[in-house]
Amino acid sequence: MRVLTPSLYIYAFFIFCVRFKCGNRTTVASAIRASYDMPPKELRVGDMLKKTSQPNCNYRTRGKCRKFFFVWKLDKMRDAHLGVQAKRRKNHLRSGSATYEASLGEHQLKGKRKESATNVEKEKKEKEQQEERLPVPKVGNKMPEKKPDWFHVPAPTGKKYNKLKEDLKKLKLHTVCEEAQCPNIGECWNIGTATIMLLGDTCTRGCKFCSIKTSSKPLAPDANEPFNTAKAICEWDINYVVLTSVDRDDLPDGGASHFAKTIELIKFSRPEILIECLVSDFQGNVDSIRKLANSGMEVYAHNIETVRRLQKFVRDRRANYEQSLRVLKIAKEINPMLYTKTSIMLGLGETKEEVLEAMSDVRQHNIDVITFGQYLRPTKNHLNVVEYVSPQMFDFYKEEGMKMGFKYIASGPLVRSSYKAGEYFMKSLVEQRRGAKTHAQG
């Protein structure tokens, strides 16, 4: 009868342990593959088969002991790993899924990240499909059948209207009231209020809602325009004036120097007059913004025109939503004493949620005043009106805006960015600030 050697007993015990711990696995390799989802770095067989320092392993039996202690170490590693996982799950229940996922290893999060990326792509695609279904304004599209009654305004007439028109023509000055075909021209001019348009009557941009003439190379600005503007304003019996301009991307500074010179001349002649300036974005040029912000004006205005989604359909490609908001923010940072102002046209296919989102973005950029008005198509060659927004909806946006913290909101079908209703309120705001400043200096 053959006697079994101790080495055979050890080997048989090793096979039993492998079968017991790893199911039907009969080799070391298959045992490794059934390693209870342990981290890859802990599965290096070379690390687990290093020379052991166990006291019962002498030189002859060291190799056999390694096999035994491999199973022993595998078991210990498995228990430790499961213990860590249990602790993580416990923390997950206490502090939420974000903490739990942050505690997981890279190999464990790989599947979740892949699934998360797929969900993000799916949501993005669904959002794009929803936006495609929303109406957008286009040149030549069908207009609403009938203009509501609240848009019927009387034709511009009156002595002041005629005198103002003659003065502007004599001094070769342009107004946005005429160029943009504003429906309030008769009302504003009869109380001696006009919005002077500087830098000529030709714009270098081609926004699809605007009726002002366009050209890539307009005539050079009139050098006498700042003097003529200051002369006209000083002759008129007004305390609040609005200056605006066309976009002049052909000029190095966008026309900022010309604009600033006009303001300085007006302030030199009549220091008490309040000036609001509706300016371009100057392509985001900080030096041009600084020049205007420090020129002496009280109100710095620049319009975002419409909600984020409709920017590419409504505005020139050189203008964008983020840049317009950034311009107003920079102006306020340069001169904190300025009031900043913007305007949004309604009726171009925007949704209520998009308008509220735009209002929130505007307020986050520390802009003080916002106005809302109905878009009206100047000619058949411009964007169509998607809808006529009701006066009740304009009132709703005004109420929501006041909750957001705007200092003033002008909201109505016929309201425009330089509408007189806003001027009265802005005048009182500026005078209050002036009084507070004088009191503090005294």
Curated annotation (Swiss-Prot):
Q: Where does [4Fe-4S] cluster 2 bind?
A: C203, C207, C210
* Radical SAM core domain location: 189-407
UniProt KW Plastid keyword: yes
Q: What general EC class does the enzyme of this chain belong to?
A: transferase
Q: Which cofactor does it need?
A: [4Fe-4S] cluster
Q: Where does [4Fe-4S] cluster 1 bind?
A: C177, C182, C188, S418
Q: Source gene?
A: lipA
Protein family per UniProt = Belongs to the radical SAM superfamily. Lipoyl synthase family.
- Where is the protein localized? Plastid, Apicoplast
Q: What is this protein called?
A: Lipoyl synthase, apicoplast
Compositional bias ranges of the Basic and acidic residues kind: 114-135
Q: What is its EC number?
A: 2.8.1.8
Catalysed reaction, written as an equation:
[[Fe-S] cluster scaffold protein carrying a second [4Fe-4S](2+) cluster] + N(6)-octanoyl-L-lysyl-[protein] + 2 oxidized [2Fe-2S]-[ferredoxin] + 2 S-adenosyl-L-methionine + 4 H(+) = [[Fe-S] cluster scaffold protein] + N(6)-[(R)-dihydrolipoyl]-L-lysyl-[protein] + 4 Fe(3+) + 2 hydrogen sulfide + 2 5'-deoxyadenosine + 2 L-methionine + 2 reduced [2Fe-2S]-[ferredoxin]
HAMAP family to which the protein is assigned, alphabetical: Lipoyl_synth
Does the record carry Nucleotide-binding as a key word?
A: no
Question: Per the record, what is one GO cellular component?
Answer: apicoplast
Keywords, sorted A to Z: 4Fe-4S, Apicoplast, Iron, Iron-sulfur, Metal-binding, Plastid, S-adenosyl-L-methionine, Signal, Transferase
Cofactor binding: number and manner: Binds 2 [4Fe-4S] clusters per subunit. One cluster is coordinated with 3 cysteines and an exchangeable S-adenosyl-L-methionine.
Species: Plasmodium knowlesi (strain H)
According to the record, the residues making up region (Disordered) are: 104-154
The signal peptide stretch is 1-23
The pathway is: Protein modification; protein lipoylation via endogenous pathway; protein N(6)-(lipoyl)lysine from octanoyl-[acyl-carrier-protein]: step 2/2
The main place the protein resides is plastid
What Gene Ontology molecular-function terms does this entry list?
4 iron, 4 sulfur cluster binding; lipoate synthase activity; metal ion binding
